[in-house]
């Protein structure tokens, strides 16, 4: 979860969201899995309060990896991940422009080490969207570049 903006801050434009992939915030893991399967999503596993999905559509793009995060209060966040073996901000830029068109300018945009970038949008109701791009080493030791889109509250 990113650091929230000051209490007086209000977004210029914000489209509230109440669900992720059709699963409402606060929904329990078992109910979520059934709903996702019934909607045709590829649930690849679950455990430790995370539901793992593969090849998920979001913002008119396919994301090879998606995770839904849960607490005692049910679903509270998600992460959609796309990686490449070479430095390319193409997906980041496409998603950024899509979010810009719907939600207006982000609350913050940060430059990260190694040419990465992070943009954060906040709603006035505690909802947030983060979009990250950056390089990281995988467990096998290879360098990959990740575009990560997160929704939460």
Question: Model features per residue range: what roles?
Answer:
Residues 69-72, 133-135:
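Short, low-complexity Ser/Thr-rich regulatory SLiMs
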Residues 20, 61-65, 73-75, 116, ...:
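Extracytoplasmic
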Residues 1-48, 82-153:
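Non-cytosolic coordination micro-motifs
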């Amino acid at each position: 979860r990113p650091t929230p903006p000051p209490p007086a801050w209000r977004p210029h434009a914000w489209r509230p969201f109440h669900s992720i992939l059709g699963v409402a915030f606060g929904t329990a893991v078992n109910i979520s899995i059934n709903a996702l399967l019934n909607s045709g999503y590829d649930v690849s596993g679950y455990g430790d309060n995370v539901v793992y999905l593969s090849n998920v559509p979001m913002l008119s793009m396919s994301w090879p990896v998606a995770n839904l995060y849960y607490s005692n209060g049910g679903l509270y966040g998600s992460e959609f991940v796309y990686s490449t073996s070479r430095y390319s901000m193409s997906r980041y830029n496409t998603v950024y422009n899509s979010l810009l068109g719907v939600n207006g300018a982000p609350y913050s945009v940060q430059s990260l080490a190694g040419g990465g970038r992070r943009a954060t949008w906040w709603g006035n109701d505690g909802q947030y969207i983060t979009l990250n791009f950056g390089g990281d080493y995988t467990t096998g030791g290879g360098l990959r570049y990740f575009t990560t889109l997160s929704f939460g509250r």
